[in-house]
C-alpha cells in the first residue's frame, strides 16, 4: 500500500512539474514549416516589439489575444509555435496556453525567441 501511495504521489508531482511545458522547435524546423504554410506562430513580445520586427506570419498575441480563436486555423492538429524574447523568457507560455485552451494539440515553443531567430539569420516581417 505504501509503495502504491508513493508511486501515486510521484506521478502527480511529475505531472504538476511538466504541466504547461511545451516541446522546443528548432529554427530550421520552424523556418521550413513557415515556408510550407503548415504552422501558426504566436508572438507574445507586445505591439512595440511586433512592429519593429516579428517572425513572418506571426500573430501579435498582446494585441489580438481575444481574437486568437478567429486567427488560428480551424484544424486543431495544426502546429502552433509560441515565442517571446529569447532563452530564459517564459512569456511564450501565455500564448501557448491560450492555444491549448482553444483545443490545439500540437503546440511547440521556439526557445531561442525573436533574438535567436534574428541571430540565426531569420527573416523579419514588419507591420
PLM feature spans:
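Rhodanese-like catalytic fold shared by cysteine-dependent sulfurtransferases
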Residues: 2-6, 15-28, 36-39, 48-82, ...
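Structural scaffold elements adjacent to functional motifs in cytosolic proteins
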Residues: 41-43
Amino acid at each position: 500500500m505504501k509503495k502504491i501511495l508513493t508511486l501515486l504521489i510521484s506521478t502527480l508531482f511529475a505531472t504538476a512539474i511538466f504541466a504547461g511545458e511545451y516541446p522546443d522547435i528548432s529554427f530550421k524546423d520552424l523556418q521550413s514549416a513557415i515556408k510550407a504554410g503548415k504552422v501558426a506562430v504566436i508572438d507574445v513580445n507586445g505591439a512595440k516589439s511586433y512592429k519593429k520586427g516579428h517572425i513572418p506570419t506571426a500573430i501579435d498575441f498582446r494585441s489580438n489575444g481575444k481574437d486568437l480563436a478567429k486567427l488560428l486555423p480551424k484544424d486543431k492538429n495544426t502546429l502552433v509555435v509560441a515565442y517571446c524574447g529569447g532563452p530564459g523568457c517564459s512569456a511564450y507560455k501565455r500564448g501557448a496556453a491560450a492555444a491549448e485552451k482553444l483545443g490545439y494539440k500540437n503546440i511547440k515553443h521556439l526557445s531561442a525567441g525573436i533574438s535567436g531567430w534574428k541571430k540565426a539569420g531569420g527573416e523579419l516581417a514588419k507591420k
